[in-house]
Design a protein with these regions (language model features):
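Extended, compositionally biased flexible segments
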Residues: 85-175
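N-terminal flexible segment immediately upstream of the FAD-binding catalytic core
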Residues: 57-90, 132-138
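Conserved, structured C-terminal
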Residues: 2-18, 22-65, 69-72, 148-150, ...
Length: 429
């Protein structure tokens, strides 16, 4: 990996992840990197490949272990990151879990698992929501689309696929015993492409029917359509993503994935990008990574994700962990997710945070994610959980990395303004 950012991450053992998938603890020298990114397919389990694996190999995607997805392409992580911010990049996120929830009672069933209000969500709209447990902890974060075709389209983290499916099937069995009309279909033959960046609509629009005008298709809206007006290439398009930029997530069959990808690349605008820039883009945008920034011991209140909890759901208090979560909403939580900026070495996950005043030896929090920000000229940024009394923006704290104490500051997130293509609001005079 050629960029300063990637070397920085490797040297500090930061776990690079793509929404829910840990690539590895990236330590070592260039020789070990080359060994890790070898294009030898003989030892790669088919179950760990996406439909676009051969495309990545043939187009210089630097494959890493685990899920065989590229960390980067020929461009450095920084170059891909900045290109996404200025133009458009395509990410293969086909490893993520895609499911359909079907049946007349699908909304009633799924609301028993999450915190959001699906009943009042308009058709062909999506929302970010959370699976929670009875203790108020976050089991996973996910995107749910309420389609006009009579099903819910759900996309959740690959790293939680086993746990999510077990949870879903347990709850499904209970629902069926109660007489609910509901079922789940795992879309194992579907790929998922994320086209992200300010020129994404320019890339995608020529491949859509004239009835789908992207200038009137807004953030978190969804549509089932045909790619290139070809009825043999149906696809679901959501205007959403994990970079903070305008963009689209396109669900297509594995059989059509490479064809669609090549068509998008033929614009000469979009470039391929890997998991390295995806991680730094989401961090700059203040977006959580499951397993780092949220987990089963973290509540939506602590994670500053209370906006995902629907007003009706709060009133009914009928979601898992509602008693604990609503009590924290009323009285506050003991800790809070915050943004930090620091000088010196970049803080990585697990680095302890201490009070810079009074008792400087007392640990008041821990870093959960960190990287040098490409958009901010490699300014060190990170997310952390800090005791609530110390979480005020502007508060100074200290971090210790390799026996060196450095100052950090609590800052607002996102670190870089998000640029979602939102519907215009009607302002009353």
């Amino acid at each position: 990996m050629s960029s300063f950012l990637t070397r920085n991450l490797i040297n500090r053992g930061l776990i690079l992840q793509c929404r829910g998938i840990a690539l590895s603890s990236l330590k070592g020298n260039n020789k070990s990197e080359e060994a890790s990114t070898s294009h030898n397919t003989a030892n790669v389990s088919p179950s760990k490949k996406t439909a676009l694996y051969n495309f990545h190999v043939n187009n210089s995607g630097r494959i890493f272990c685990g899920w065989t997805l590229p960390v980067q392409y020929s461009a450095s992580v920084i170059q891909s990151h900045l290109y996404t911010r200025s133009d458009a990049s395509i990410f293969d996120v086909s490893h993520m879990l895609q499911i359909h929830v079907k049946g007349a009672d699908r909304v009633r069933f799924f609301e028993k698992l999450i915190v959001s209000d699906l009943e009042n969500l308009p058709e062909n709209s999506a929302c970010l929501t959370l699976y929670t447990n009875d203790h108020g902890g976050i089991l996973d974060d996910l995107i749910v689309t309420k389609t006009s075709e009579g099903y819910l389209f759900v996309v959740s983290n690959a790293g939680r696929a086993t746990e999510d499916l077990a949870h879903l099937h347990t709850q499904l069995a209970k629902a069926k015993r109660q007489g609910l009309d509901v079922d789940i279909e795992v879309l194992s033959n579907q790929a998922l492409l994320a086209l992200q960046g300010p020129r994404s609509a320019e890339v995608l629009q020529p491949h859509l029917p004239s009835s789908l005008d992207l200038s009137k298709f807004y953030f978190m809206q969804s549509r089932l359509t045909n790619f290139d007006n070809n009825s043999s290439i149906p696809c679901r398009i959501n205007r959403s993503g994990y970079t903070g930029e305008d963009g689209f997530e396109i669900s297509i069959s594995n059989a059509n994935a490479e064809r669609v990808l090549n068509a998008l690349l033929s614009s000469g605008i979009a470039q391929m990008a890997g998991l390295g820039p995806r991680d730094s883009l989401r961090l700059e945008s203040g977006l959580c990574l499951y397993g780092n920034d949220i987990d089963e011991q973290t509540t939506p209140v602590e994670a500053d994700l209370t906006w995902t909890i629907g007003k009706r759901r709060r009133q009914l208090a009928d979601f898992p962990g509602a008693k604990i979560i609503l009590e924290q909403l009323e009285k506050g939580a003991s800790r809070k997710r915050v943004g930090i900026k620091s000088s010196g070495s970049c803080p990585r996950s697990g680095v302890e945070i201490r009070n810079s005043r009074d008792d400087k030896s007392r640990i008041i929090g821990k870093v959960t994610s960190g990287c040098p920000s490409p958009s901010l000229k490699l300014q060190n940024i990170g997310m952390a959980y800090i005791e609530t009394p110390f979480s005020k923006v502007g508060n100074k704290v200290t971090i210790n990395i390799r026996n060196r104490t450095m100052e950090a500051e609590i800052v607002k997130m996102p670190f870089v303004p998000t640029r979602y293509y939102k519907a215009p609001t009607n302002k009353k005079k």
